[in-house]
Amino acid sequence: MKFSIISVALASAITVDAHGYLTIPFSRTRLGAEAGLDTCPECSILEPVTAWPNVTEAKVGRSGPCGYNARVSIDYNQPATNWGNSPVVTYTAGDTVDVQWCVDHNGDHGGMFSYRICQDQELVNKFLTPGYLPTEAEKQAAEDCFEKGTLPCTDVNGQSCDFSPDCQQGQACWRNDWFTCNAFQADSRRGCQGVDNAALGSCFTTIAGGYTVTKKIKIPNYISGHTLLSFRWNSFQTAQVYLSCADIAIVGDSASTTKVSATATTLVTSSKTASASCTPAATVAVTFNHLASTSYGESIKIVGSISQLGSWSASSGVALSASQYTTSNPLWTATVSLPAGTKFEYKFVKVSSEGSAVTWESDPNRSYTVPQSCAESVAVESSWK
């Protein structure tokens, strides 16, 4: 009993410290920060709650699956001018994609995290309707649905899916479908920042600078013109849970579209999405949004297995624009028109100021399939590895 009292007191004393939010794909929280409305995107906190060792015990309350930031009084469960009105990225069912969140330097309290997709479109639509704020009962119902739709770490071939070093076998946290941070008290590569071991400032936070935490997820065999990817981080040291979400679309590839669309529960329409009678796009404008910190004079190119990306020749690759680049958000972008259904592998490269030295990303190659749908444009989010 003494331990419990001390633990609660300790957690209460340091609850202001843990901070993090979803950054790739662009979450509603990130969009709120980039619009200048959220002055602390890492501060959407559900507290005090039981966050450990049972990582699914806590009810989400007003935080919902998308998060509530009490510091700036923003409820991300409701669409607003700068978020929630349309997907920020389109994925293909069955694809493996990069996802990333940002943990603040002063707020890395270890723990475990998960990515989730709720396949109850009627319920999700309550979080997509402009002017409507879901009730707490609807928020919890959605959270329960997202929990059922957890995208297991183990679904991605070759991905390391360890058990948390801060959890003991037999505890509720002893599961590797969720992703784990490194040991909270590790001597090196500690906590969540140790997952990528990226440099301080590799992602944006307002308190002390952030560290990226990057993983891969497999998109489920589900089609939606507009749905949500929810992120949940349970802190190990503090009684806190962090939630955020991103608006996404999921299309089927040529082999699965007919099969998946035949199930009435997975086909989605909305005022923002083309109807089923639209003409499929022959070519798609694929925008690559890539985060990569560079030195003065360096540039970024995308090089790949198809001719439009230089056929693996760095000199023939597509140069990305740094027009939106900032120190806190080192964004490089390029848009390439590609035939629908095109499958390819690719990497990003850094080119020196003289153009003579080229640094390639680490293996493995990235892969992508251009959606075959009515959408004429899609965005692909990533960061340097």
UniProtKB/Swiss-Prot annotation:
Cu(2+) binds at H19, H109, Y242. One of its GO terms (biological process) is polysaccharide catabolic process. InterPro entries: Carb-bd-like_fold, CBM20, CBM20_glucoamylase, Cellulose/chitin-bd_N, Ig-like_fold, Starch-active_LPMO. Disulfide bonds join C40-C43, C66-C245, C102-C203, C118-C145, C153-C161, C167-C173, C181-C192. Binds 1 copper ion per subunit. Belongs to the polysaccharide monooxygenase AA13 family. Residues 19-248 form the Chitin-binding type-4 domain. Its cofactor is Cu(2+). Glycans are attached at N54, N365. PROSITE patterns: CBM20 (PS51166). It comes from the Eukaryota. It comes from Neurospora crassa (strain ATCC 24698 / 74-OR23-1A / CBS 708.71 / DSM 1257 / FGSC 987). Residues 1-18 form the signal peptide. GO terms for cellular component: extracellular region; membrane. This is AA13 family lytic polysaccharide monooxygenase NCU08746. The modification Methylhistidine is found at H19. SUPFAM superfamilies: Starch-binding domain-like.
